[in-house]
């Protein structure tokens, strides 16, 4: 009998911030750690592939969809905090901007940069998301993860997670984040931390195209360079491929103008890479996770 939170033939476009992608053969939406363990076990018993969707940012799903089980973590949210010690534990599906606001109201310093990141705690940990010179690894103590292959659960400390720019051991080993522990700095006033948080949010709203569907930043920044600046200097703002467009607001964003497909996005990424390589001699590396492509 099917787990009640696993459903067949579900459209995935609405679960991504690009609003793009085909169907999942199966879709699981766990609400707690026990349910995700059951869903991974369900997939393992049937020998089918298991893919994770967090907030759906930084994600491109094939127009033809995904074979196997897609697990969307959005319903698996919640957190506990101690405003005396600054210890915060959040479930993987907790939206990062929500957590940033909640801890700010408790006078906890350390996540102000995260208020404009359109992702979940789990997704941010997997790719070591960051902004304004800070990143997820800065305040992380440990992550509880599950292996989809073995079903084993581990708590991995920060030093063993091999964090680097937009990389982690979790990403390399294809582990699934269940929850994350952070150590934030207590003792600040709510007003002070909220003010800093709001300044970061307003900066992002002024400089990034939040009014249109996008995945967030498309390319990793090369060493000591900004991908957006490189693309802008080549005059590529506004470049279109089908319904996909290089944002006129920030060149490291590709926006969906209403009817973009994964094929449009893929082709536009390729065009940008070729133009940058021709001019600068290196290939910009996407930070977008691709699902359903072979």
UniProtKB/Swiss-Prot annotation:
GO molecular function terms attached to this record: FAD binding; UDP-N-acetylmuramate dehydrogenase activity
GO cellular component, one term: cytosol
EC number per UniProt: 1.3.1.98
Active-site residues per Swiss-Prot or TrEMBL entry: 166, 217 (proton donor), 287
UniProt cofactor(s): FAD
Key word Cell cycle present: yes
Location within or outside the cell: Cytoplasm
Pathway(s) served: Cell wall biogenesis; peptidoglycan biosynthesis
Listed InterPro entries: FAD-bd_PCMH, FAD-bd_PCMH-like_sf, FAD-bd_PCMH_sub1, FAD-bd_PCMH_sub2, MurB, MurB_C, MurB_C_sf, Oxid_FAD_bind_N
Enzyme class: oxidoreductase
FAD-binding PCMH-type domain: residues covered: 19-187
Keywords, alphabetical: Cell cycle, Cell division, Cell shape, Cell wall biogenesis/degradation, Cytoplasm, FAD, Flavoprotein, NADP, Oxidoreductase, Peptidoglycan synthesis
Catalytically driven reaction(s): UDP-N-acetyl-alpha-D-muramate + NADP(+) = UDP-N-acetyl-3-O-(1-carboxyvinyl)-alpha-D-glucosamine + NADPH + H(+)
One GO BP annotation of this record: regulation of cell shape
Regions crossing the membrane: none
Entry keyword annotation includes Cytoplasm: yes
Biological role: Cell wall formation.
Family indicated by similarity: Belongs to the MurB family.
Protein name: UDP-N-acetylenolpyruvoylglucosamine reductase
Origin species: Prochlorococcus marinus (strain SARG / CCMP1375 / SS120)
